[in-house]
Amino acid sequence: RHGIRLTGLSHHAASIQGGRAAAAPAAASGATAVIAYNDLVALGLEAGLLELGKRCPADISIVGIDDIDLAGAVTPALTTVRMPIERSGALAVDLLLQAMNGTAIDDVVTLGSQLIVRASTAAPSAS
């Protein structure tokens, strides 16, 4: 759909080391962009791809999830999805207490997110 081909990579740890381990399979896949499980994986992926001679974002765009402080401090700064972690934790506790008190709770709770565009993403090259 929309000319996008999705390729899943095998499971790697949700850490910088896991991201480094995912670099070779990501490079071999021919992907022009990767959305990582979290920012730590994305940062490890960025480092691992650089070691393989791949430039971010010229060769491959990388997006993380969480918007940890380090995401904006690296070069290139990491594009990421900011999640309302504190709000979701507080909401989870509220829902648990409601359920324990026998109060009916919504089956689905939607929390917003925000894409923070930084320097790790760009349009794919024409080649």
Predicted segments, located by residue:
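Bacterial carbohydrate/catabolite-sensing allosteric modules
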Residues: 1-127
